Every structure is written in structure tokens, then in C-alpha cells.
UniProtKB/Swiss-Prot annotation:
N6-methyllysine sites (modified residues): K287
Single Gene Ontology MF annotation: adenylate cyclase binding
Protein's UniProt name: Adenylyl cyclase-associated protein 1
N-acetylalanine: modified positions: A2
Compositionally biased residues, Low complexity: 218-228, 243-255
Gene3D superfamilies registered for this protein in UniProt: 2.160.20.70, Adenylate cyclase-associated CAP, N-terminal domain (1.25.40.330)
Membrane topology: Peripheral membrane protein
Lineage: Eukaryota, Metazoa, Chordata, Craniata, Vertebrata
Assembly and binders: Homodimer. Binds actin monomers.
Modified residues (Phosphothreonine): T307
UniProt keyword list: Acetylation, Actin-binding, Cell membrane, Isopeptide bond, Membrane, Methylation, Phosphoprotein, Ubl conjugation
Entry's Gene Ontology BP terms: actin filament organization; cAMP-mediated signaling; cell morphogenesis
Annotated PANTHER family: ADENYLYL CYCLASE-ASSOCIATED PROTEIN, ADENYLYL CYCLASE-ASSOCIATED PROTEIN 1
Length: 475
């Protein structure tokens, strides 16, 4: 009975796909996709079925949700259309050399970057989990360059999306079914693509054995919906007419120049002889009299390429992050922010603060541990930590505990101020390879007394072992 039910479900899915191909052609073309021609290769026709099925459903639901999700979906659709164009090209042409192949793949690569950039530019979006699911998996479009296992690569990207789609399901499961359907439609694109690859491109994109070597993408959709740019601007105005008077002057100058050249060797008769006392290298006194030499304009020369053996690449600014990933709070690449707050904390959670500059962060509640890594001018205020607060590879860091913390570890850090509360006076301060460390103890009046952590030590051999003691700097 169960087998019969499964068979019925499979038949229903097959019928639904056929209906999508036959009855949604208008909608399909409305999104800018050209329908398969009768002579198209089987794997191009199969890809069109994917576009007409799960992709069309994903676009439809994204349009219903609207906003950033709809905009993102349109970018994804453009990438899929570019991929279709590559498939058409591969079905008609032979595979080019690697350097030419990269040119064919460039439009798809650029579209992938655009999808990812859109997520980074809209971190404040209410639909950020939707954008993240797409951004983390859109690189699946790169399967065309993956050999010999493009299918597993797509599955890996699909799994990356599920981390965020699970968040969408958790948030909207009992609120809005439309978002649940969106998750199913989007993930089905990649599962269907895996099946498609397994059937037609198991070990990599299949190219034609005949025809010309591919030079450019074929089968790109036409019209404004194809994602192409605006038409080129009209040509500029023609150049102004040439002045006849200036032309005659130039002609006269040119004639005079040729007349001088035609003199041949006799032209040197007008040159003046230079005696030794007029030469600066024979008469040093001339150098002192002449003063600084003014150089005339340099003749034009084509710019020469830089010959530096190791040019430094431009520094790429990483996006700022403040999010909960599993049980880890990630606070990364924050700059010049003074009001960061994490208040939805649990005992099993940890906080990892990385590459933050001139930033203040407050962590409320009780968490397991905090790590500060590679930060500069960071101010950290926290309530309670049951494990350890670790500061490593940082400069000019100030931490203040409002409740209790058992251990503060300072490693490879220059400049650290630790403000303790009355409940954390028994805190252990463990330091290594660090300098300018101070512990501040609260007073009855509400102020703090500052005590430096020793940095200079004296070690002696007592006959049996090394004995190390703290030394004070004299003077």
C-alpha cells in the first residue's frame, strides 16, 4: 500500500512538471527565458524544464513575499539564464582552452558576486535569513566549472543554505505558510539540479564534439528582462570644423621644416663650436655660476607597467558581523560603534569578538565564555561568565565585569585594563607575552584603584630548580 502511495505521489509530481512546462509558457517568457527550440540539445530542454518548474515556483513565491526577497530572486534568475546560455553554447560548440573558458564563465561569476553582495549590503533586512540562504548557496551555479564531481558540489551548497532555511522555517512555521513554501521551492532548485547533473553531466559539463570552438555565450535572452544593461548612449556631436587659417600656418611651418632638413650636412655649418672652457665637465667653475638647472617638459612616453616583484593587493574590508551562529555569538569587523548590545543570552552560549576597532560592546546575562581576538581600542562590559574571558593578540583593550568571572587570560596583548566588581575580587589573572596590564579594584566610594600586573621577573637557580620572582623597575 505504501509503494502504491509513493507511486501516486511520483506521478502527481511528473504531471505537475508537465503542466508547468505546457501551461506556464507565458509566465516563463515574462521572466525573460526563451522557450526551448525543437532542435535544442536534450540537456538544454531538460534545463528549461527545471526553469519552468521549481525556478518558476520560487520566483512566483518570492514575488508574493516582495521586497528584498523578490529583488534577490531576480538576481538569481539572471544567473540561471546565463547558465542556460552557457549550456546552449556547450551543446553547439567545442570546449575552448582554459583561458578562453574563464571568459565564458565570467558573466556567471559576476552574477554570483552580485547576489552575495546584495546580502552584505542588506544586513539590516527583516528577511536577512532568506537573503543568507540564497547567498550561501548561489555558488552552486559554479558547477559548470567543477570536474569530475559537480553533483556533490551542488549538494554541499544546498546544505549550506539549509542552515538559514531552518531559521526561516522556525520563524514562520506557525506564522506565514508562504515562507515555508518559499523554502521548499528554493531548496528544490538545487535538489532538481543535482538530479539533472547526475543524468546529463555526471563528471562535468558536456561539450559538443563538433562545431566551432566556443568564443562567446549563445542563446542569451533578448529584451530588457534579460538582465542586460541599458542601450549605449547616442554618439557625441561631430568635431568642430578645422580652421582654414590654422591649416595654412601649419602647412607653412611644415614646409620650412622640410626645407631645413633637405640641407643635409650643410645644416651643421650654422652650429657654434664649443671650447673646453665652455664645458661644465672640463670647467667646474661653471657649475657654481649656473645655479639650479631647470628641466624642460619631458617628451611623452607610454606608461610602463609596474615591475615590483610582489605588489600588495588592495585591502578588502570585511563585512561587519553581529549574529548568533548555533551557540556562538559572532561579533566581527565592527568599527567605530559605541552601542553594541547582546542581551538574548543563555548559559551554554559563547562570544567570539574578532577584529573590532574603537568599539564598545555590552553582553548581558550569564554566558559560558568570551574570547577577544585581534581587537584594538575595544571596550567590553559583561555581567557573568562561568568559564574564562580570554584576550589575545589585541591592543588597548578595556574589560569590565559587573557580576562574576573566575579567570581572565591575557596573551600577546599590549595594553589591557581589567575592571573587577566586588563579586569578582577572587578572579585569577593569567598573562603571557603581554605588556601594560592593569587591574582596577573597586573602592567603597565607587572609584577604582589601579594596580599594574608585573612584567619584569628575576630567575635564579637554587641548586635544585629555577626560582622566579617579581622584580620592580628601579628609578
Amino acid at each position: 500500500m505504501a509503494d502504491m502511495q509513493n507511486l501516486v505521489e511520483r506521478l502527481e509530481r511528473a504531471v505537475g512538471r508537465l503542466e508547468a512546462v505546457s501551461h506556464t509558457s507565458d509566465m516563463h517568457r515574462g521572466y525573460g527565458d526563451s522557450p526551448s527550440k525543437a532542435g535544442a540539445a536534450p540537456y538544454v530542454q531538460a534545463f528549461d524544464s527545471l526553469l519552468a518548474g521549481p525556478v518558476a515556483e520560487y520566483l512566483k513565491i518570492s514575488k508574493e513575499i516582495g521586497g528584498d526577497v523578490q529583488k534577490h530572486a531576480e538576481m538569481v534568475h539572471t544567473g540561471l539564464k546565463l547558465e542556460r546560455a552557457l549550456l546552449v553554447t556547450a551543446s553547439q560548440c567545442q570546449q575552448p582552452a582554459d583561458n578562453k573558458l574563464s571568459d565564458l564563465l565570467a558573466p556567471i561569476s559576476e552574477q554570483i558576486k552580485e547576489v552575495i553582495t546584495f546580502r552584505e549590503k542588506n544586513r539590516g533586512s527583516k528577511l536577512f535569513n532568506h537573503l543568507s540562504a540564497v547567498s550561501e548557496s548561489i555558488q552552486a551555479l559554479g558547477w559548470v566549472a567543477m570536474a569530475p564531481k559537480p553533483g556533490p558540489y551542488v549538494k554541499e551548497m544546498n546544505d549550506a543554505a539549509m542552515f538559514y532555511t531552518n531559521r526561516v522555517l522556525k520563524e514562520y512555521k506557525d506564522v506565514d505558510k508562504k515562507h515555508v513554501d518559499w523554502v521548499k521551492a528554493y531548496l528544490s532548485i538545487w535538489t532538481e539540479l543535482q538530479a539533472y547533473i547526475k543524468e546529463f553531466h555526471t563528471t562535468g559539463l558536456v561539450w559538443s564534439k563538433t562545431g566551432p570552438v566556443a568564443k562567446e555565450l549563445s542563446g542569451l535572452p533578448s529584451g530588457p528582462s534579460a538582465g542586460s544593461g541599458p542601450p549605449p548612449p547616442p554618439p557625441g556631436p561631430p568635431p568642430p570644423p578645422v580652421s582654414t587659417s590654422s591649416g595654412s600656418d601649419e602647412s607653412a611651418s611644415r614646409s620650412a621644416l622640410f626645407a631645413q632638413i633637405n640641407q643635409g650636412e650643410s645644416i651643421t655649418h650654422a652650429l657654434k663650436h664649443v671650447s673646453d672652457d665652455m664645458k661644465t665637465h672640463k670647467n667646474p667653475a661653471l657649475k657654481a655660476q649656473s645655479g639650479p638647472v631647470r628641466s624642460g617638459p619631458k617628451p611623452f612616453s607610454a606608461p610602463k607597467p609596474q615591475t615590483s616583484p610582489s605588489p600588495k593587493p588592495a585591502t578588502k574590508k570585511e563585512p561587519a558581523v553581529l549574529e548568533l551562529e548555533g551557540k556562538k555569538w559572532r561579533v566581527e569587523n565592527q568599527e567605530n560603534v559605541s552601542n553594541l548590545v547582546i542581551d538574548d543570552t543563555e548559559l551554554k552560549q559563547v562570544a567570539y569578538i574578532y577584529k573590532c576597532v574603537n568599539t564598545t560592546l555590552q553582553i548581558k546575562g550569564k554566558i559560558n565564555s568570551i574570547t577577544v581576538d585581534n581587537c584594538k581600542k575595544l571596550g567590553l562590559v559583561f555581567d557573568d561568565v562561568v568559564g574564562i574571558v580570554e584576550i589575545i593578540n589585541s591592543r588597548d583593550v578595556k574589560v569590565q565585569v559587573m557580576g562574576k568571572v573566575p579567570t581572565i587570560s591575557i596573551n600577546k596583548t599590549d595594553g589591557c585594563h581589567a575592571y573587577l566588581s566586588k563579586n569578582s575580587l577572587d578572579c585569577e589573572i593569567v598573562s603571557a607575552k603581554s605588556s601594560e596590564m592593569n587591574v582596577l579594584i573597586p573602592t567603597e566610594g565607587g572609584d577604582f584603584n589601579e594596580f599594574p600586573v608585573p612584567e619584569q621577573f628575576k630567575t635564579l637557580w637554587n641548586g635544585q630548580k629555577l626560582v622566579t620572582t617579581v622584580t620592580e623597575i628601579a628609578g
